[in-house]
Amino acid sequence: MAVPKKRTSISKKRIRKNIWKGKGSWAALKALSLGKSLSTGNSKSFFVRQKKNKS
């Protein structure tokens, strides 16, 4: 089994953690933006079927 030879420094660990958090926050922002555009009907990437009223 692979074992690291030396301990990872605190600064390197913090940098990697911030990159990981940044990717998550970016994905959440994109998901929120897509949800907003779908709810307002301004989405250009999704086609949502409109319900037809029979009355």
Swiss-Prot record:
GO biological process: translation
Top-level taxon of origin: Eukaryota
Record localization: Plastid, Chloroplast
Disulfides per UniProt: none
Keywords attached to this entry: Chloroplast, Plastid, Ribonucleoprotein, Ribosomal protein
InterPro entries the record matches: Ribosomal_bL32 (IPR002677), Ribosomal_bL32_plant/cyanobact (IPR044958), Ribosomal_zn-bd (IPR011332)
Pfam families (UniProt xref): Ribosomal_L32p (PF01783)
GO cellular component terms, semicolon-separated: chloroplast; large ribosomal subunit
Gene Ontology molecular-function annotations: structural constituent of ribosome
PANTHER family referenced in this protein's UniProt entry, alphabetically: 50S RIBOSOMAL PROTEIN L32, CHLOROPLASTIC (PTHR36083), LARGE RIBOSOMAL SUBUNIT PROTEIN BL32C (PTHR36083:SF1)
UniProt similarity note: Belongs to the bacterial ribosomal protein bL32 family.
Name the record gives this protein: Large ribosomal subunit protein bL32c
Record lineage: Eukaryota, Viridiplantae, Streptophyta, Embryophyta, Tracheophyta
